[in-house]
């Protein structure tokens, strides 16, 4: 990127930087994303978000890592209703896999080598018993044993860490009041955390990325569209992503983003460009048309200047626009700020 392009790009991202600063984002990083070769870049981009003043809670998955650990121990497990049936023997492998995966994430976020994206970052990553879990129990005649689900999120404790400027890292293992350990679905944890914190965004990062139809990326989805796709999908991973997004968005989370871990820079592109890179899900993504105000003058000038340079429009001064602002209407895009 040459200097002029870099300066232009930086200027274009500045409204997003201002808008995101101080906001709470919950990021769900799938085990497949952690196993992907682009993982270290994704984690460095997450660290960059923290340095820009975004309050982050990162929840990681570990399904491929658990599968590998189980295979090494010659332990077979089965799935039902998209959940792993976890017996006591398998639970030991789950703890080992989740623990080692968490250490990989923490080590990447602790880097600070000169001439690296992490130089000078000095992130504080914290963990704790921020949630209580309960057993899934018996469903449709199937005993899920040590597989659990979220009972409660301690939003106040998480908020205290965010106020201190820490990044909160949560793993998909929860504990009951009696000290039992349960294997949890990381997407379910992420949805519960985002809802409890009243987060502005829930971002699901996985190899699946955005939702595709006939080879085309669906950039925006409403809740009814998400529900319809979820019911009709035959892809388990896609169903899981859509179910998580639907639950979060239907319970107060403003926006849910589905982002690919395989595309370098996809997370930053999704958050800091108008086009994005994945699928954005909102409760209502209709456009709003309203009368322009004096505060819109700068934005209108930015929009019409290229057309004035091409002599498509007659050139207007700022003073003239301010005088005639009542004659203008603006279309507010949901993807806009």
Residue ranges and their predicted role:
Residues 284-315:
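Short amphipathic alpha-helix that is part of the acyltransferase structural core
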């Amino acid at each position: 990127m040459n200097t002029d392009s870099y300066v232009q790009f930086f200027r274009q991202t500045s409204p997003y930087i201002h808008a995101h600063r101080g906001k709470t984002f919950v990021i769900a990083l799938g085990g497949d994303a952690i196993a992907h070769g682009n993982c270290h870049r994704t984690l460095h981009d997450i660290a960059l978000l923290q340095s820009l003043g975004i309050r982050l809670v990162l929840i990681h998955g570990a399904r491929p890592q658990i599968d590998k650990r189980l295979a090494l121990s010659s332990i077979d497990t089965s799935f039902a209703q998209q959940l792993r049936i976890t017996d006591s023997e398998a639970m030991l492998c789950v703890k080992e896999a989740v623990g080692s995966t968490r250490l990989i994430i923490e080590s990447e976020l602790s880097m600070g080598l000169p001439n690296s994206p992490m130089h000078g970052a000095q992130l504080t990553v914290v963990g704790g018993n921020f949630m209580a879990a309960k057993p899934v129990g018996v469903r449709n005649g199937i005993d899920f044993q040590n597989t659990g689900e979220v009972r409660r999120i301690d939003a106040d404790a998480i908020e205290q860490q965010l106020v201190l400027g820490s990044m909160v890292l949560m793993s998909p293992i929860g504990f009951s009041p009696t000290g039992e350990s349960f294997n949890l679905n990381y997407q379910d944890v992420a949805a519960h955390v985002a809802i409890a914190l009243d987060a502005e965004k829930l971002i699901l990062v996985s190899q699946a990325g955005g939702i595709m139809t006939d080879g085309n990326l669906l950039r925006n989805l409403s809740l009814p569209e998400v529900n319809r796709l979820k019911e009709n999908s035959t892809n388990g991973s896609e169903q899981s992503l859509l179910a998580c997004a639907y639950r979060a968005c239907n319970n107060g989370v403003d926006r849910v983003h589905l982002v690919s871990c395989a595309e370098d820079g996809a997370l930053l592109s999704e958050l800091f460009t108008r086009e994005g890179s994945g699928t954005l899900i909102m409760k209502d993504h209709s456009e709003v048309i309203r009368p322009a105000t004096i505060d819109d003058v700068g934005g209108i000038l930015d929009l019409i200047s290229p057309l004035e340079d091409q002599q498509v429009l007659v050139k207007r001064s700022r003073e003239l626009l301010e005088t005639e602002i009542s004659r203008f209407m603006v279309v507010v895009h949901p993807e806009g700020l």
